[in-house]
Amino acid sequence: MIISENKPINEILGFLKNVEKVVLIGCNQCAAICKSGGEEEVLKMKEALEIEGKTVLGYRILDPACNLLKSKKDLKELKSELADADAVLSLACGDGTQTIVKNLKNIPVYPANNTMFIGETKRIGEFEEACKACGDCELGWTGGICPVTMCAKGLINGACGGAKNGKCEVSQDNDCAWVKIYERLKDIDQLDNLLEIRPMKDYSKPVSYTHLRAHETLSDL
């Protein structure tokens, strides 16, 4: 899930300083779960903007905002409002906001949210980072625990030696990723995975459009 949070209202108003009429767009999936862009949050934003003298012509909660074709269809329901608006304010994640931009060629689209990370819900209102979308997943040999995300140093070949009582030396609030990986591999009888020396992570590897079309290649097999 994409974790996002609302930008400070002053930053949002800065985007809209020359805007009188605005349309609001939310997302019924990740942003709704994060309480940053569901219908409730869109209505709160509407109220906040109207207090500041803005005219909100309408709103739509996309499901989801990041589906290019579906969003294009759903946004047609706001055709008249969009034609009269000075700008669109997106309460979706960065991906959803860019999807909206692709569907609305002739009107500015501004973000109301900051996209934080890919993560999971620990409990209501509390989220934990789980993936950095590095494009070269390591989970297959680490027991499903990500060293790139969980290790503060992003180490690939085991712990740094600074962990104490299972906690990271960078922050005692965090578990040592490699202790967790060791324990997991022990549980599933795959400790031999730690004997192989892994190459340094290649962060120059581009995540290109080719990756996004991989499903088409697989469907041709």
Regions found by a protein language model. Name each.
Residues 184-185:
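Mobile "lid/hinge" segments at catalytic clefts and subdomain interfaces of large enzymes
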Residues 210-217:
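Conserved small/polar residues in nucleotide/adenosyl-binding loops
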Residues 204-209:
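Assembly/oligomerization interface modules of large self-assembling protein complexes
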Residues 194-203:
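Long, compositionally biased charged/polar accessory segments in the mid-to-C-terminal portions
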Residues 1-163, 169-172, 177-179:
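Iron-sulfur-associated redox domains of electron-transfer enzymes in respiratory
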